[in-house]
Every structure is written in C-alpha cells, then in structure tokens.
Amino acid sequence: MRRLNRALSGRRLPDTALEEITEVVHILADRFDAGTERSKLDDMMTRPHLAAIYSGQYTPLDLEVGEEIEFDPFSLAAGEFHPASIGLTFTKESDDSGVGKGTIDPMFAGPPERVHGVIQALVIDEVMGALNRMRGRQAYTAYLHIDYRGPAPLGEAVVFRAWVHETD
C-alpha cells in the first residue's frame, strides 16, 4: 500500500489509469470490507512489551544505544501496519532521549518542496511517545506547542529528537 500511495501521489497519471485504479480498489475494498474488523488494542496486545504496558507493568525496554524502539505498529509516523506510514525509525539515543529518523516523502507535502506542518507536529508527538515507551511509561499529549523555525525538506534525511526535561 505504501508503495502505491507514493506512486499515486508522486506521478502524473492519465485519467484512464486513475479510472482503472479506482475500479480495482473498489473491488478489493468490497471484498475486504466483508472481513473481520481489526482491533488495534488486540493486535498491540500480541507484542509482549506493549501488552505489559497496557496491563499496567511499566518496565523500561532493555535497549542499547542505537537500537530501534518499537512504538506503535499502527503509527502514521513509523508503524509497520499503517498503510500510509511515513516510514520513520525511532532509536534510543540515551536513557533519557530518543531519535526519529527517515526521509519524508512528497506525499506529505504542505507548501511545495516542504513537509506539511501537521506532519512535523505528528512526528514530534510520536518521537516523544516512543521515548515514553522506551522508558516504560505511558502518557498522552495534553498540550503541544511548536514554534516552527523553518521549513522541513521533503525527500531528504531528517532527524527529530526528544528528551526528558522533567518528570511529574
């Protein structure tokens, strides 16, 4: 799906191709809509460290610096199960910091040649969430304020960092 999403958003296609894609997608959607509905929580509970957190066991992940943090498999930023995932990876930088890295595709453009601001906010939120997961904590964003200092480029490697400033 990700490959198709990127191909459709990044290529000029004739109307006949779009009509063909629409027809095939409707046929597949009708077939898949008849299937069993998926539960994100049930799927997340198949991952031992996620099941532990959702069961109230807040244990830090046993990761070395540079190892990947598995956050949310359905995450728009990095989830392997999300059909439009940006495809970022989250890694441990230290016991109190994490990094999100990747290349953001033109599918996520705001202004020409720039990453949409809401995508930047999403990635910042997800990197902070991955850091909490790594530290064995569960938290939800109550407030997120961003002062954008400049545009983020599309199609180039980007790095987002999160660190613990204070814990209540």
Predicted ranges, named:
Residues 1-101:
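Non-catalytic linker/capping segments at the edges of enzyme domains
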Residues 146-168:
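Hydrophobic beta-sheet segments that form the core/acyl-binding groove
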Residues 93-95, 105-107, 151, 167:
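Generic structural motif
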Residues 139-143:
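Short, structured beta-strand/loop micro-motifs enriched in basic residues and often containing a Trp
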Residues 93, 97, 115-138:
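Active-site helix/loop of acyl-thioester processing domains in fatty-acid/polyketide metabolism
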Residues 74, 106, 138, 152:
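Flexible, active-site-adjacent loop/turn segments at secondary-structure boundaries
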Residues 104-118:
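Short histidine-centered catalytic/ligand-binding loop motif
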